[in-house]
Amino acid sequence: MKTLEKLFAEKLLKIKAIKLQPANPFTWASGWKSPFYCDNRKTLSYPSLRNFVKLEISRIVLEKFGQVDAIAGVATGAIPQGALVAEELNLPFVYVRSTPKDHGLENLIEGELRPGMKVVVIEDLISTGGSSLKAVEAIRRDGCEVIGMVAAFTYGFPVAIEAFKEAKVNLVTLTNYEAVLDSALKTGYINEEDVPVLDNWRKDPAHWEAGK
């Protein structure tokens, strides 16, 4: 039986949500050059896969975190899936902006949380973990307890692993970088010669250069 990590990795590859271009890297908003790009928001356009993600995240929330009082999605990528999970579990939903609105109530958190609530945060992708953990901080400032985070995918960067450890946030993901690379190699999505390039990038993405 396939693990969830491998199964979801295959599904992402099937809908071409994963782009692997070692010779022609992407440029992230951070300025990092990357041979790997994950656009798992594409799952929203496939009803059966969208439902799969909703049910798997909901199962993880129930199995891993016990009593949960609310679901929070990190804007903007995790808002749709977070809302679907909250609906499935019949729980209140909020979402957390990256910056407060510049008009109206200037909210950072949209929706209603009450002090003492136990919250699970939903995220679509973990890279450095910075924006995800800012959302956690905002929820904690509201007097709530973040009991965990569930994300669709993580790159597994050392900086993110350390950041989540320091923030004392239990992170669970549906799949990860290693599972996607393994599936991509087995299905011919990438070649053997691509693997060292991709491995070197993951070890030090901030300083990686194509062809080196």
Swiss-Prot record:
Keywords from the UniProt entry: Glycosyltransferase, Magnesium, Pyrimidine biosynthesis, Transferase
Pfam family of the protein (one): Pribosyltran
Cofactors required: Mg(2+)
InterPro entries: OPRT (IPR023031), Or_phspho_trans_dom (IPR004467), PRibTrfase_dom (IPR000836), PRTase-like (IPR029057)
GO biological process, one term: pyrimidine nucleobase biosynthetic process
Top-level taxon in the UniProt lineage: Bacteria
HAMAP family: PyrE
Annotated NCBIfam families: pyrE
Job description of the protein: Catalyzes the transfer of a ribosyl phosphate group from 5-phosphoribose 1-diphosphate to orotate, leading to the formation of orotidine monophosphate (OMP).
Protein name from the UniProt record: Orotate phosphoribosyltransferase
Record gene name: pyrE
